[in-house]
Amino acid sequence: MFNIDLFEKNLKTEKIGKKNYYYASTCSTNNDIWNIFKKNKKAGIVVIANEQNGGRGRGNNKWYSKKNKSLICSFLIKQKFSNEQLGLHAILVPLGIVKGIKETIGKNLNLKWPNDIIYNNKKIGGVLIESKNIDNTIYL
């Protein structure tokens, strides 16, 4: 089971993880993060769940997780970039996640474009990037 205290103790970041929220079960970490942001208007927050029963994928696809078998998280950042650079996040974020997992656990993961994380020819995860323009600032 995920340990939020251990996570926060070992988190070494400047922007992401300033405030973390953990839920044993949730409908969608993405929905949670936008709802939290509406209240406090601060970027750098992370939402982590042990189980998700209404996650979204591309299009109308649903993403379900098994309790104690998945890492489900969303983070929200505020960045200054042009509309042309916005598309780079769709490439760089999944690449960074796969690289980080490879370096941490030493498993050979791959990326099936645009957002599927593959291990042993099976999809084990996905990356969903949502952006919103709020008060002329882009949040991801």
Predicted ranges, named:
Residues N68-S70, I134, Y139:
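Alpha-helix termini
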Residues M1-E103:
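N-terminal lobe of the biotin/lipoate ligase/transferase fold
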Residues K99-N136:
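Acidic (Asp/Glu) carboxylate-rich active-site/surface patches
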Residues K19-N20, G44-V46, N110, G125-G126, ...:
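Structural motif
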